[in-house]
Amino acid sequence: MKNVLIIFGKPYCSICENVSDAVEELKSEYDILHVDILSFFLKDGDSSMLGDVKRGTLIGNFAAHLSNYIVSIFKYNPQTKQMAFVDINKSLDFTKTDKSLVNLEILKSEIEKANYGVWPPVTE
């Protein structure tokens, strides 16, 4: 069973789309799940299944810790049911306007280094 990369992006965001396209190159190593963050957090979105308290906590955590990320990536281990935050910002080159803005070697390294169960995320 492969680990899962969960990509939280925004609709109509070219950087999010380019990151998603680049990460697709890792699909032989990971299952990849793309999540539209706005739809996810809508009142009737998928986050509503968490219940009001957990949903509110999740929204608060996103706002507090991930608001400076255009796109967020987590890795998920389906066997242990643990998640880890992946610091994608280290792999991005914003001078590029296509999927080459993601340095896949750096991203792979960040995915491997991401520690399960660490929250809030430790960023350098």
From Swiss-Prot:
Keywords: Disulfide bond, Electron transport, Host cytoplasm, Redox-active center, Transport
SUPFAM superfamilies: Thioredoxin-like
Location in or out of the cell: Host cytoplasm
Tagged with keyword Transport: yes
Any single Pfam family the record assigns to this protein: Glrx-like
UniProt superkingdom: Viruses
InterPro entries for the chain: Glutaredoxin-like (IPR008554), Thioredoxin-like_sf (IPR036249)
Role: Glutaredoxin necessary for virion morphogenesis and virus replication. Functions as a thiol-disulfide transfer protein between membrane-associated OPG128 and substrates OPG095 or OPG053. The complete pathway for formation of disulfide bonds in intracellular virion membrane proteins sequentially involves oxidation of OPG072, OPG128 and OPG088. Exhibit thioltransferase and dehydroascorbate reductase activities in vitro.
Annotated family: Belongs to the glutaredoxin family.
Name of the featured protein: Glutaredoxin-2
Organism: Vaccinia virus (strain Ankara) (VACV)
Gene: OPG088
